Curated annotation (Swiss-Prot):
Keywords: Cell membrane, Membrane, Transmembrane, Transmembrane helix. GO terms for cellular component: plasma membrane. This is CASP-like protein 2U3. Signal peptide: none annotated.
Amino acid sequence: MACRVMEVLLRVLAILLSIAGALVMAKDKQDTFVMLGTVPVPLYARHSYVEAFVFLVYANGIVAIYCFIAVLLSLLAKSRVLAGLLFFMDQALAYLLLAAAAASTEVAYIAKRGEKKLVWGEVCSNFEHFCNLVGVSLVLTFLSVLVLVTLAILSGKRLFGHPPLCAPPSTPPVHQGV
């Protein structure tokens, strides 16, 4: 029972982290002006301008929906087939979210530092607020990845562990006096 509660709490935590990561990124935008001589030129930053950030929003949304469904399934049904499916899906979605976070981290790094070999300048000096919120979203997303990895480890131990994790404690045999 304690393991089921821990699993549900971890899945709820993954839901909250993924929703927060998606919302922070999806709402992230900034408008600014730079001066070219005496002419102000408007600049705009939106998450939708960068495909990696869009991927991050969708991946976080998929993880949140999956974890919600997994909570319902784990509360309603208990079978080895379901445990195997959750083990597989926890890993698959951890990899999906890790891929989205890694791609977005690379874009954020280039935005912050630029890429000298390609003569790409950094842009975060013009969009500091935008870049800071990208960082917040990435932290939330990587935390969600860690929760999913923890769930995959717990699922694997439950399926393949000897003795199985969360197995009911065995009671010693009662000796009757002769």
